[in-house]
Amino acid sequence: MKLKVTVNGTAYDVDVDVDKSHENPMGTILFGGGTGGAPAPRAAGGAGAGKAGEGEIPAPLAGTVSKILVKEGDTVKAGQTVLVLEAMKMETEINAPTDGKVEKVLVKERDAVQGGQGLIKIG
């Protein structure tokens, strides 16, 4: 399996051997707005569980907003990094899933967010 990993702003292409005997029973987990199979199932709503609305880019995991790279009114392209989340001392780039215009930035830098919470609305 080939993966693209970004470390400290430098992108690397990585080959990974997959041990099929230890498949993840939770399904596919996507980070940084990547594409792939179905997203991992979400836990049943508990206190503070976030849920992105229509047109909103959801946080793929709980963390802290490190950088917001766009502002309302900006035009974005699919795959463009729009925000960076920090979780467990690792940065995760959040990419626009489609081309569009930033309608609303729903968070501020240093905000704590929950997995699934809407970050940016694109129309």
UniProtKB/Swiss-Prot annotation:
Residue spans crossing the bilayer: none
PTM sites of type N6-biotinyllysine: K89
Pfam families for this protein: Biotin_lipoyl
Effect ascribed to mutating M88 to A/C/T/L: Reduces activity at least 10-fold
GO molecular function, one term: methylmalonyl-CoA carboxytransferase activity
Keywords, alphabetical: Biotin, Transferase
CDD domains: biotinyl_domain (cd06850)
Domain (Biotinyl-binding) ranges: 46-123
InterPro entries xrefs: Biotin_BS, Biotin_Carboxyl_Carrier/Decarb, Biotin_lipoyl, Single_hybrid_motif
Domain of life: Bacteria
Enzyme Commission no: 2.1.3.1
UniProt enzyme class: transferase
SUPFAM superfamilies, per database record: Single hybrid motif (SSF51230)
Catalysis performed (reactions): (S)-methylmalonyl-CoA + pyruvate = propanoyl-CoA + oxaloacetate
Function per UniProt: The biotinyl 1.3S subunit serves as a carboxyl carrier between the substrate-binding sites on the 12S and 5S subunits.
Subunit structure: Transcarboxylase is composed of three subunits: 1.3S, 5S, and 12S. The core of the enzyme is composed of six 12S subunits. On each side of the core there are three pairs of 5S subunits. Each 5S dimer is attached to the core by two 1.3S subunits. Thus the total number of chains is 30 (6 + 12 + 12).
UniProt name for this protein: Methylmalonyl-CoA carboxyltransferase 1.3S subunit
Native source organism of the sequence: Propionibacterium freudenreichii subsp. shermanii
The organism's taxonomic lineage, starting at the top: Bacteria, Bacillati, Actinomycetota, Actinomycetes, Propionibacteriales
